[in-house]
């Protein structure tokens, strides 16, 4: 089905059903083009109001609704909320890219319906495993960081209003990347010194964008500080632990966790248990210990009942958390029980929903 779609409703992955021309009749994009972020930006900069989209052949993409359609275990209402949030974040990102600011009401449209749904789903491990299959695009990354920040804030005892603000700061922490060259937005590997210097500016860009758009200094500070580390090794200001805002400490833990969960260039990926171990170790120096401990101690009980694959090739189920070594639980394989705290040569490779 071919539809005439307003430019504000166009999504990455949509396919043009006709050539797109600017107001002077100069061709911009050809029929059949699968729209990328840069393509949509081009159309917006030429002030096109509507384009022809072939909805019978919409391509999948990181930010499209199909990003979560392949997750059968996800409840329909939650899936719809995530789809809507991804689309809204794209609108927010594009508005920032083309206008240098974004509408405050977009952030509420992004958050309100989603947080109502995820708050009912207390098993954060299952939620993160559901989202694990999504592409590691800026949009989905920001969504995951915002969700995990919301959980951590609640575990630390923050009020519902504070949890909302911390979650919003998590969603917006990378909004400054809208001002980066497209090749750098997703953190290109092996950047040269010049590229790395430009990439690191996204923290300041984010601060400026949020202040211009929301006039919210705390949310802006989170965007500015989310790469600061407690030992002074971060950027842009090389702050130490006590100089980092409490909200930033939470978002930084969530951001680090989600970053560790991405697929590496060689196709490898760290398992959930290994990621939790790495976060735990960072809590002694770079990350603040309170949000780290909240993450570890609240996620660990959610591992009980999950199916796992061990690095010896066997599959089993976690039946008991080990309170003295949270990363080495008791696993049942058929009639046999394996205490990983004692059999330390065996490790959990992967956790399943």
Feature names for model-found ranges:
Residues 131-134, 186-194, 223-224, 247-248, ...:
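Short alpha-helical linear motifs
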Residues 20, 184-185, 191, 230-235, ...:
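Short clusters of hydrophobic/aromatic residues that line enzyme substrate/ligand-binding pockets
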Residues 61-198, 211-213:
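Acidic/His-rich, divalent-metal-binding segments that scaffold phosphate/diphosphate chemistry
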Residues 145, 166-168, 172-179, 196-293, ...:
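Alpha-helical scaffolding flanking metal-ion-dependent phosphate/phosphodiester catalytic sites
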Residues 40-41, 150, 207:
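Short glycine-/small-residue-rich flexible loop motifs, especially phosphate/cofactor-binding loops
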Residues 1-98, 102-105, 269-353:
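Terminal helices and disordered tails flanking the catalytic cores of nucleotide-processing hydrolases
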């Amino acid at each position: 089905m071919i539809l005439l779609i307003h430019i504000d409703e166009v999504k990455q992955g949509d396919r043009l059903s006709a050539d797109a021309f600017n107001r002077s009749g100069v061709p911009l994009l050809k029929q059949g083009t699968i729209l990328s972020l840069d393509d949509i930006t081009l159309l917006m900069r030429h002030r096109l109001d509507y384009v022809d989209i072939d909805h019978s052949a919409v391509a999948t993409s990181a930010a499209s609704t199909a990003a979560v359609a392949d997750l059968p275990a996800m409840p329909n209402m939650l899936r719809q909320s995530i789809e809507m949030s991804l689309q809204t974040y794209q609108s927010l990102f594009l508005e920032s890219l083309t206008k240098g600011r974004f509408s405050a009401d977009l952030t509420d449209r992004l958050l309100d319906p989603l947080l109502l749904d995820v708050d009912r789903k207390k098993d954060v491990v299952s939620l993160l495993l559901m989202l694990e299959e999504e592409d590691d695009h800026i949009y989905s990354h920001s969504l995951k960081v915002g969700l995990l920040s919301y959980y951590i804030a609640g575990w630390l005892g923050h009020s519902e209003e504070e949890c909302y603000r911390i979650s919003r700061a998590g969603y917006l922490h990378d909004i400054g990347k809208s001002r980066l060259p497209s090749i750098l937005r997703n953190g290109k590997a092996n950047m040269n010194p010049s590229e790395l210097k430009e990439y690191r500016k996204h923290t300041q860009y984010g601060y400026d964008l949020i202040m211009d758009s929301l006039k919210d200094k705390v949310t802006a500070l989170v965007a500015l500080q989310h790469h600061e580390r407690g030992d002074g090794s971060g950027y842009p200001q090389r702050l130490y632990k006590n100089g980092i805002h409490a909200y930033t400490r939470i978002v930084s833990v969530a951001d680090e966790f989600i970053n560790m969960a991405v697929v590496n260039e060689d196709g490898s990926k760290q398992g959930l248990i290994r990621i939790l171990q790495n976060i735990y170790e960072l809590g002694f120096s770079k990350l603040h210990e309170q949000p780290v401990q909240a993450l570890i101690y609240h996620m660990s009980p959610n591992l009980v009942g999950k199916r796992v694959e061990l690095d010896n090739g066997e599959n089993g189920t976690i039946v008991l958390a080990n309170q003295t070594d949270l990363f080495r639980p008791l696993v049942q394989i058929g009639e046999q029980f394996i205490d990983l705290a004692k059999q330390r040569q065996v490790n959990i490779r992967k956790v399943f929903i």
